[in-house]
Amino acid sequence: MTYASVTIALPAEASDSVGWAASELGTVLKRRGIPSAEGSAAGGGTVVEVVTGNGKPSLNSPVELPGKEESFALYREGAHIVAWGRDDRGLVFALMELADRARYSTGEDIFEGTFPLVEKPSARIRSMARLFCSEEEDKVWFYDKQQWRDYLTMLASNRFNRFSLTLGMGYNYPYHNPWITDVYFYFPYPFLMKVPGFDVEIVELSEEERDTNLEMLKFIAREAAKRGLEFQLALWTQRYDFDDVPRANYTVAGVTDANLAPYCRAALTQLLTEVPEITGLTFRVHVEGGIAEGEYGFWEEAFAGVAAAGRPIEIDMHGKGLDHKMLQIARETGMPFAASPKYLAEHMGLPYHQSAIRDREYPPEVARSEREKLSEGSRKFLRYSYGDLLTKDKDYKVIYRIWAGTQRVLLWGDPDLAAGYGRSSMFAGSDGVEWCEPQSFKGRMGTGIPGGRFNYQKQGMATRYDWQKYDYQYRVWGRLLYHPEAPRDSWMRYLARECGDAAEYCEKGLSFAGKVLPLVSLTHGPSVSNNHYWPEVYTNLPLIEGTGQRAYGFDMDAPVRFGNAPTFDSALFVTAREYAELLLAGKTSHRYTPLDIADWLEELAEGCNQAVLDAKKTASLVSPAVQRIMVDVEICGGLARFFAEKFRAACWAELFIATKVSSLVEPLLDHARRAVMAWERVADISRDLYHDDLTYGPQSWLRGSWHTRLPQIQAELLDLESLRGGGKYESVKADGTAQGAIDALKARRAVVAGSLDIEAAASFTAGADFDVRISGQIEDEPVLHYRHVNQAERWKSVKMVRNGDGYVASIPGDYTRSEFHLQYFVSSKRNGQAVLTPGLDGKLANEPYYTALQS
């Protein structure tokens, strides 16, 4: 179908954001050589009829418009297209879908795609956070108005409904005081305005620059509102030791202990008055934001400043250290309020919420210090997950934040995981997710480099704006968070336009590659902190104790070695050390082992490799867009092989450490060599492509590149070679126990996701027994594992009993009588194999447990 012109028929009551979306559609059509104008739906030629809410389209509808907010439908008959939205945002999404088709169409029909298309949101909140951490690198994008127009348009096009400009997140008070250098926007208020009645200023900052900063903030907020986006301003720091940071590049003058709270209160009210488009504020409410835990008076005053603005402003409180007193303070303001825990530590794992936190995250008997009495004391279980926030009758939102510890540089784009996040972000009454965008923390703590956000040293690889490398990433993430069943053409049209005949291989490669580092992050967790653990550019944790202490020693229990690094889900995964102990004890486990993880990683590596080989046969390989994708896919494939071999080597290493049996050395060395070879290949790829120093912080483990990590990885292999004999390792033969463990390791069979039939209610009544029945191929007594949806608690288990052709078990009413929902799974055996039901499926994107909601 060809188009001579297009008439866009807007309803009389169309909002500004709907008008903007219609204008954007017209602009895209004009670029494609097709004139457009506003007019009547009854006009001739091609008509895009825009229908709001309960309005009646002039064209009979073959579909029903969903009742959910932000839903939309597109359908057409001949040259007449109906864009039908439940509300303004739904209409924006419908019109931007048509604009997107017109922008990326490669055929005659510029609106080609799925018709009819009906979509409704899964995650209610779909937020993107952009962090200002470096004066050197971030002022460039902060002051670029066209960059903001394009960036915010991209977010609206991809179904995001919130943008968070995040300030003050670059340091953690007081732990980072010695590192404080670049403090631009760290304590944000005096960088933006003069607050009457307070003699507070940034000594080195001119009034002109301060005023420019505020005008830019106003501009960004207006542009977000124009596109129908909520504008969240995240203010992570409320104070630091202003007089005890001699290396800081800006000086905060005039703040005292006495006037801090009144100043912040007045500043918040003024800021919200000056920028009326702000819809919410995010606060870090534990000690790292500068306020000692338990100093509730400060927050009462600060939140009063929010309420004084005279309009609804969402008060979003970062989850770490959050207690019920803080929730009550927010509640008493009358403002909408939310808690935003971390999704999985400060990393990105698989989409499901971890079944259990690390042992180190359970509350200690005594808090580490008085000012950390919550985050390192009674509320420690909330440091890195949802804690006890998901009660049945909660009156606040729970919005998860995915931190950028896992993957910062390489392009990500797996539709499977993105759809999984769309489903799991609503877990047990949750409300959505905020993603710290690619390159978050770039140039942090004074490590900014001019032009550093582009990362490439090879000419011709950089995009105009740094975020444009990740266009596909934003697309897949936003659209599948919104609608996990979104049609494939919604991302393939982009790849077809940008990557030509390599499009399908780019899609496959990014899907395989996108699972690699989330899987590694979930299963290998030497540190929860993104300030220490960066699996993408990995600081090597050795198989035998040695190096690694500085990067990881503060955050994992000794011994500090690869096989003892905890997982981020101890309910479903065992470490190599735990696995070796089970083997030596002649026991088995229902949990996934490091060898299961290695097998998954090997499959992902093969998928990456095949996609690269196929893409190299295409004519489009010369395109920078294809090259950017394929080199990152190849690097991820190499990382998958590296970690697969490290996991395998760790199993042999842990048996060797426990027994000193000499025959264990060769298989250990074999896998260690393969790991080094995989990293050498990654280094070869990165050496001429990426800069030597990718800076995300001043410490060695937060900077560098794959090729600069190579010497430490090769050095470990040389150390391991010495285990062959001599020195303190004499020849030791295996006794019966050791030989049994070796034989069991060699004969190991993978844990599989179960195919058992489960019969259980989707909901329950508190105080009533909750019955679970299973049937299918079962070899021995299955076990029901269950827990409240509360990370402060540990899992319980009960053996299921035979009942007819299946097994049954009950979660007792005394246990269900709580304020929490339930989660559960079943472990069993089949033909000698451990079976988890439901377990993780082949896409690694599902929830490996069932959830029953309290009615």
What are these regions (language model features)?
Residues 437, 441-710, 716:
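C-terminal non-catalytic alpha-helical accessory regions
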Residues 29, 87, 155, 283, ...:
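Conserved, mostly hydrophobic/aromatic
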Residues 105-106, 161, 173-176, 181-182, ...:
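Catalytic-core regions of glycoside hydrolase
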Residues 87, 132-134, 169, 235-237, ...:
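Short, flexible loop/turn elements at secondary-structure junctions
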Residues 38-65:
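Short, well-ordered secondary-structure micro-motifs within conserved domains or adaptor modules
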Residues 236-261, 274-279, 286-296, 627-644, ...:
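Aromatic-lined, polymer-binding surfaces characteristic
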Residues 720-855:
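Glycan-association/targeting regions that enable binding to alpha-glucans and other polysaccharides
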